[in-house]
Amino acid sequence: ATDLEIARAHICVPNIAAQVTEAHRAACGGALTLADAWAEGQIANGFALVRPPGHHAMRMVHGNRGFCNLNTEAVVVAHLRRQHGIQRVAIVDTDVHHGDGTQDIFYHDPNVLVIGLHQDGRTLYPGTGFIGELGGPGAFASNLNIPLPPGTGDEGYLYVMEELVLPILEAFQPDVVINSAGQDAHYSDPLARMQVSAQGYARLTQLLAPDLAVLEGG
């Protein structure tokens, strides 16, 4: 990713060079390549298997937050809008941690719907992502947090996806659905307390059927 592509999503303090490594550029660049291929009709969907992760990186970047310096999904959204005319975007974050950076960046944007399924912020970093955080005054109801209790497994996640997330996406009618695809709600993750299985994640992804997925934590 170039400085200009990064600057469309972030303000880096004191500058981009101080906050961004080649690994960050490669991760964002890989996701941008995938997004271009999708937008140009070369692929029906795709998964950017990139690291470092990004969903804790906020608009203002002044250091690492939860292993994140650049918000890959935000860089992708800015690129899709500028290069491909995409307007309405849905980001569904299934990482076990709340994507506080993604929420921060799009909180006042009525054309980006951000939905997060995550372990209750009272029990896990970053301590945010509550149901009352619904978007700014000009973008009310464009941010939906679904905090889940520790111990939630396949049944709980799939119920929320089918009964809440999918109907909301249907009503919003996005041009593109992006999955912030954290894998750390898996029962083996040492930093969280959820009980999702590999089969549960597979079914979750099958139901969501995102156009683009970007690897996050786990």
What does each model-found stretch correspond to?
Residues A1-G218:
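HDAC/HDAC-like amidohydrolase catalytic core signature
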